[in-house]
């Protein structure tokens, strides 16, 4: 039996709805997709693309190009592509929490999410820092953000923090939690019995024996030593400027970076179109596109669906394993 997955477009004025319409043009055999969105927005996106869409009841199978099972989420205001309306912030959050709630109840087996506009959600009166944080709070469990493409997987100890706040956030507890969640996910979700995880240092040259900072000596190395004694295969701390050399990437299954812009530029350079965002640690698979709302492209029919296609395929595989 194929898994049932929620598909949440995200910001209705962005490219999320039209990417869902494109996805619906190719019926899948690996998953039953149910889109959590406003039906009028989906019809408008289909019209803008000159493509057909037939919205079905959630339990109806998609058999023909354009078939799209729908869990309706009504917006407060009509969609104008390229122009977000904070009045629709509640609908965006309702779609995310509704889909995730159905995963927690066992009704669905995974969730694929499109891009959300943080500023618009907050302008709508809802405190929101990101979908990863939202779903973690709902599930009540610690999570790790991992971005991946066909070349490399990168997990983050810290995510959306100002750079000046990062050193203080790199605690022994935070690092150990990130490494344990990453290792467990590599085993459970990716089938790697003994995952090899590279760990980057925080400072240039991984601190150079304390000359360029003491975080490696005081925090990172003691944590790695402790977890190695528990059986984890950890490499590092490695200098970030050489860790991603092609000949080194074959030596490990995932990389743990200390902060957002330390690990992600290389991943995005090596294959941005196919990159996806995976939330490790949730009780269900959640995979997201690795791009923004692209308001300037919305409704024009030129948005690249590669990341959504990759996210959906990966979520289906992860859900089938769980």
Curated annotation (Swiss-Prot):
UniProt keyword annotation of NAD present: yes
GO molecular function, one term: zinc ion binding
Main location: cytoplasm
Keyword hit for NADP: yes
Residues holding substrate: 132, 268, 277, 286
InterPro entries: PdxA, PdxA_fam
Catalytic reaction(s) noted: 4-(phosphooxy)-L-threonine + NAD(+) = 3-amino-2-oxopropyl phosphate + CO2 + NADH
Biological process annotations from GO: pyridoxal phosphate biosynthetic process; pyridoxine biosynthetic process
PANTHER family in UniProt: 4-HYDROXYTHREONINE-4-PHOSPHATE DEHYDROGENASE (PTHR30004:SF5)
Listed name of the protein: 4-hydroxythreonine-4-phosphate dehydrogenase
